A protein has these predicted regions:
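Detector for outer-membrane/organellar transmembrane beta-barrel domains
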Residues: 238-335
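Outer-membrane beta-barrel "beta-signal"
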Residues: 351, 375-387
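Hydrophobic h-region of N-terminal signal peptides that target proteins for export
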Residues: 10-17
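N-terminal periplasmic/intermembrane-space "pro-region" immediately following the signal or transit peptide
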Residues: 5, 17-72, 387
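Sequence/structural signature of outer-membrane beta-barrel proteins
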Residues: 74-81, 112-118, 151, 202, ...
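C-terminal hydrophobic structural anchor segments
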Residues: 316-367
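Outer membrane beta-barrel
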Residues: 54-219, 227-234, 238-247, 314-317, ...
Length: 387
């Protein structure tokens, strides 16, 4: 009985003590509640912007990424008595590419699929383009990777658009296609970084009066690292008085290294390009620097003349909806003297079945003062298809 009374008295005293303490607790204006899921995931403005850019990038990839390619098949016949093969069928080009634009960046990856494995001259399947370009501002775009050298009008042009059965000798020998210095086949490309832009819009159409491009390159062609720490500097400056006409001058200062031999590659080119109802293109280029070859003992050496030059002119005229005809005069001088001249006179006819399929026939008369058979004729038939 005493134990029960003790327990009751202790409980009553505890309640009495707790009541004043409860009254001392200040009342809260708002009750404490658990945070909601939305409040727990609230983002900062920076995080929100990054998420928005990420979503936009994904959308750009879906909408702007393009896969494609083209094939050029060729049949060639000639009457050159010094040639071991006077007729030949081959795949001139097979190209596969992916390109697109994400946010302010344009990109391209292009592979050349035809050729021969482990070809020492670079004519094997290979990466030809792998670049990305920041295009935030029209007057200053920065490109990085492997891409066309900024030299001559014709070099950056697609084989579909040059208007003949092949690039001019000027482009081939002096712009890095199959360069005279002995560089492996590089399709006019090198690895580096380039700044280019357009500015000063004029006229009713507001076309830009000026365009510039300047690049720093390894100087060794595609898929090759720098060999001596000296870079090639290549640039061009364009004036466009009317939308259809461009006038330009190009410069190249660099060198090339192979087998422990270094030769200069200092070049200047200038020309014009008109794209209207007809197409006209003409360029001249000169080069200072020897070639890399072998001496009388078969050892690597700088050989050949220290200078060369080349020029060409081409005109294209459409006839009706499907036909286009071209005429081209094409000259290369390996030592800048007439005794080293190789001249080509071309007539070309193209028939477009539709925009992605055409057949092209070219007749060429060649006068080569350095060859055994100095004068010969060539007929070239090519089929172009792209997808």
């Amino acid at each position: 009985m005493k134990q029960i009374l003790s327990i009751l008295l202790f409980g009553a005293s505890s309640i009495a003590m707790a009541q004043p303490m409860a009254e001392m607790q200040p009342e809260l204006d708002h009750p404490i509640t658990e945070p909601t899921a939305t409040e727990m995931t609230l983002e900062t403005p920076k995080e929100s912007k990054m998420q928005s850019l990420g979503q936009q990038a994904l959308q750009d990839i879906k909408e702007n990424t393009k896969f494609g390619g083209y094939v050029i098949g060729q049949a060639v016949f000639n009457d050159n008595d010094a040639s071991k093969v006077q007729s030949n069928f081959n795949l001139r080009l097979i190209r596969l590419y992916v390109d697109g634009k994400v946010l302010d960046f344009q990109y391209k990856l292009q592979l050349q699929a035809n050729g021969f494995g482990n070809d020492s001259k670079g004519n094997s399947p290979r990466v030809v383009d792998a670049w990305i370009e920041w295009q935030k501002f029209e007057f200053a775009k920065i490109r990085f990777g492997q891409f066309k050298r900024a030299f001559t009008f014709e070099n950056p042009m697609n084989p579909w658009d040059i208007g003949a059965n092949g690039y001019a000798q000027l482009t081939s020998k002096l712009a890095g296609m199959s360069d005279r210095v002995g560089e492996h086949s590089s399709n006019g490309r090198d690895m580096g970084v380039q700044l280019q832009g357009d500015f000063l819009p004029i006229g009713k159409d507001q076309h830009n009066l000026f365009h510039y491009q300047f690049g720093v390159y390894n100087g060794q062609g595609i898929n090759k690292s720098d060999q001596n720490g000296h870079k090639d500097y290549i640039g061009g400056f364009f004036v466009r008085p009317i939308k259809e006409l461009q006038l330009a001058v190009f410069g190249w200062s660099g060198d090339y290294v192979a087998n422990g031999i270094t030769v200069d590659r200092k070049r200047l080119a200038y020309g014009l390009k008109y794209d209207g109802k007809i197409n006209v293109r003409a360029e001249y280029a000169r080069s200072h620097g020897r070639k890399i070859g072998t001496d009388a003992n078969g050892l690597p050496a700088a050989v050949g003349a220290n200078r060369a030059d080349a020029w060409y002119a081409i005109v294209g005229v459409p006839v009706g909806e499907h036909w286009k005809f071209w005429g081209k005069y094409d000259v290369y001088r390996d030592n800048k003297e007439w005794n080293s001249t190789k001249s080509l006179y071309n007539l070309t006819a193209e028939y477009y079945f539709y925009k992605n399929l055409k057949i092209q026939g070219t007749y060429s008369y060649t006068h080569d003062r350095t060859a055994v058979d100095k004068d010969y004729n060539t007929f070239d038939l090519q089929v172009y298809y792209r997808f």
